[in-house]
Every structure is written in C-alpha cells, then in structure tokens.
Amino acid sequence: ITRFSYIRYLNASPSSGPIDIYVNGRRVASYLNYRAFTEYMKVLPGYYRIAVFRAGTTRNPISVSRMNVIANRVYTAAFINNGTGQEWQFITDTRRVLNQNRAFVRFIQLSANAPLLDVYIDDRLVLTDLDFQEVGRYLSLAPGRHNLKLKVAASARVILEDPNMTLQGGKAYSVYIVGNMGDRVGLQVLIPLEGTTYLSF
C-alpha cells in the first residue's frame, strides 16, 4: 500500500523575488526564483506547516500556512500573489493511463490581475472564461508542435502567443499562466511535464 505522496514547489509570485521554503522547520527549497520549480519530493501524509522567507533570511516570513497532504497524490504547490498578498495554491495531478498516441494538457491560471481568458490551440477555441486560480480540465491533443494563444475572453485581443508549444505523446502537461499584466513582461506560460508522467509509487 502506498503511504506517501509527491510534491514540488513553484514560485509563481512575480513580486516576491527569490524565496526559501521551510516545511516543519526544515528547508526544502533555497533561492527559488520566480517561475522556477523544485524537483518532486516524497512526502508522508499529514498536516505540515509551510513558511516562506525572502531568500537567505529566516526572520519575518512572507507567508506561514498549513497544508494537508493525502497519500497517493502528486501535488504542485504554487506560491501565488492573490492581489492583496501571497498564498499557496495546491494543485493535484490526475493519475491516469496515458495513451502513447496522445498528449494531455490542462491550463492553470495563476495571474491575479489577468482578465478572463479564452484559450486557443491552433486557432481553435478549446477553453472559455478561464479565471484566476482556475484549474482547467485535461485536453487530449495530437503530439507535436502547436500554436497557443490566450485572448481576452469573448474578444479578438491576443495577450499571449506561443507558436511552439511542443507536446510529446504519452505525456501529461500543465500550462501555468503566470505574471503581472501591469508590468512590461506581462503574462508568461510555463509548460512542465506533470509528475504523473514519470513518477512511480
């Protein structure tokens, strides 16, 4: 019987700078930059205290919270800016049998000041009104290179385009939408493999 889970951490807060993460007083990430992920770590089920500090410091945490880890799961813990402060969003990967002839992808919106978004793949509307902190359903796509566009919902205004979103068959991906609409960089997408693709229990 599986008695553990996997978790990785993502710094998705544009304003926090590099961070150190402590779980139950033990440092699990050092100088985790904005847009960076840790590797997956094994973790036992239970409640944990999770504290975030500016990198290199151990006083005045940016955030202190609790997380409940359930056995037999694969988590991404995303540190996000919610518009008034910072918080964690815990995202569970769905374990599934992966068809080797298809790629699976979902969209996760972590930008607090982005508008509602419509998602287009190869100029086909695949998701409407994606809101902040929403985790979209999985889409099944042909492997290969795809054109990704994010548009302001119900409009023709493109606010991000990635013409080279490359997906492999038999793999599952999450597309994390991060960034601050108010700065010059704007929105960005991170497209890592999900742990369900390669982790074993």
Kindly label every feature range from the protein language model.
Residues 1-201:
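Intrinsically disordered, low-complexity polar regions and short flexible loop motifs
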